[in-house]
């Protein structure tokens, strides 16, 4: 709900089609386009021209197959419905149990796996937009043997399903820093930057030039403020450390609320 303004900008970008839902029980709003005319005339041309480069590309290509079947009115026949169910079985998390029971002869459609190759180059606008939705900015304060008894550090990260590890590696090339953590037990891979010099030299200058949109910009702003305090070594005194702790608590509160709402 707090990013409704950003959702409305997206709606305007697509020519005003669709609608923005009212907040649900978890305070989430959605931009939805459900008419075949708008999907065929606006949504498909956009994503054909500006291809997705995560695993969602596979879902999009399958979604497009369903749209074309409906455009040809094949969904009006039992055979066409079976084709759609076969495709649906390969999208997102697959089919709910009631559909599996209703269609016992399901043959899941093959997914596109090579949606990205080693020659793909990320562009700044895409990275800024992707970071708006998927990045995280953290301030860490830990006990240490320093005079204050506490040590501060910063962490920028982007996490995705492990199937998108090739994309995560692209961020290393794009930013010129960072590393990949692959959590095989959770099927998650993560691009991480923790070296303070790299955050100051690469991460913050990028987002100053290509700003993050929506409520996450506040997180970035607090993250940046903390970096300035650390750069000036003001975190070594009581007042500066208190400022760092306040900024850390603001960011932690944001992610805690996000987890609750989701």
What are these regions (language model features)?
Residues 1-262:
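Sequence-level preference for short, compositionally simple segments enriched
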């Amino acid at each position: 709900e707090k990013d409704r303004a950003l959702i409305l900008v997206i709606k305007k970008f697509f020519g005003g089609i669709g609608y923005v839902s009212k907040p649900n029980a978890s305070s989430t709003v959605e931009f939805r386009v459900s008419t075949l005319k708008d999907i065929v005339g606006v949504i498909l041309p956009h994503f054909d021209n500006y291809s997705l480069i995560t695993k969602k590309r596979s879902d999009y290509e399958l979604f497009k197959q369903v749209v074309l079947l409906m455009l040809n009115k094949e969904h009006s026949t039992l055979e066409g419905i079976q084709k759609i169910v076969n495709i649906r079985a390969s999208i997102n998390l697959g089919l709910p149990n009631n559909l599996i029971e209703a269609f016992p002869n399901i043959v899941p459609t093959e997914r596109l796996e090579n949606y990205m190759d080693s020659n793909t180059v990320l562009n700044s606008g895409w990275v800024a937009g992707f970071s708006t939705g998927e990045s995280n900015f953290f301030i860490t304060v830990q006990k240490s043997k320093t005079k204050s008894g506490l040590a501060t550090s910063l962490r920028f990260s982007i996490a995705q399903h492990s199937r998108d590890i090739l994309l995560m590696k692209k961020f290393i090339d794009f930013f010129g820093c960072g590393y990949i953590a692959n959590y095989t037990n959770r099927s998650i891979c993560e691009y991480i930057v923790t070296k303070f010099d790299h955050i100051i030299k690469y991460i913050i200058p990028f987002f100053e030039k290509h700003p993050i949109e929506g409520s996450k910009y506040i997180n970035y702003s607090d993250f940046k403020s903390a970096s300035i305090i650390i750069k000036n070594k003001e975190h070594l005194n009581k007042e500066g450390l208190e400022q760092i702790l306040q900024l850390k608590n603001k960011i932690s509160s944001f992610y805690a609320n996000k987890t609750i709402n989701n």
